[in-house]
Amino acid sequence: MEIILIFFVSHWYLSLFFQTFFLHRYASHAAFTMGPITEKIFFVLTWIFQGSNYLSPYGYGVMHRMHHAFADTENDPHSPKYDESIFKMMWKTKTIYSKIASGQEIPEKRFTDGVPKWEFFDKFARSWPSRLFWGAAYVGVYYLFATEIWLWALLPMQFLFSPIHGAIINWFAHKYGYRNYEVKDTSRNFLPFDFLMMGESYHNNHHKYGSRP
């Protein structure tokens, strides 16, 4: 049992780290710089630690810039103000993200400038064979080490960690919590759950000062 719980918690925080550090702070906001080799290393590490949840740094970065530009308007890729359920919001998010990541939608230059892009690797990492490979690896870990039947209930969550991380912030941190700053959107600080989110729940602060680390 302990091995599965360690695996689950480690996967949660490692996948979240690469989402917040590489995809969010670096790809979206250029809060710091990387050389081309370091950047490619982070692409690969993101694929390893997000696994079946891999998010394209380009797709994520562009969409997140659009979120800040259009926060809580009809053009926001994900706003609880315009979607009546968390599931509808996340499906809309997935649709927009997929179109950007695959090149089906070409956003304005202001959203794409400087966002890291490695098309060959991204296409591979987002592919179904890649996702199925990681999914099979997770199933194998559970098969070998899940000593209690209830532990298998954790497995579906591991297939969906990245969307779960996004839903916590983009739904709950726009509906619940407190505000330090009056901004032109509904962002809030959702601190009771920030132990799960590595600082991402300071969402109102982030919407006020988006480029700060």
Q: For each of these PLM feature ranges, what is it?
A:
Residues 1-168, 211-213:
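Non-catalytic, topology-defining segments of multipass membrane proteins
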Residues 26-27, 171-179:
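A cytosolic-side transmembrane-helix exit/cap motif
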Residues 54, 112-119, 176-209:
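Active-site-proximal inter-transmembrane loops
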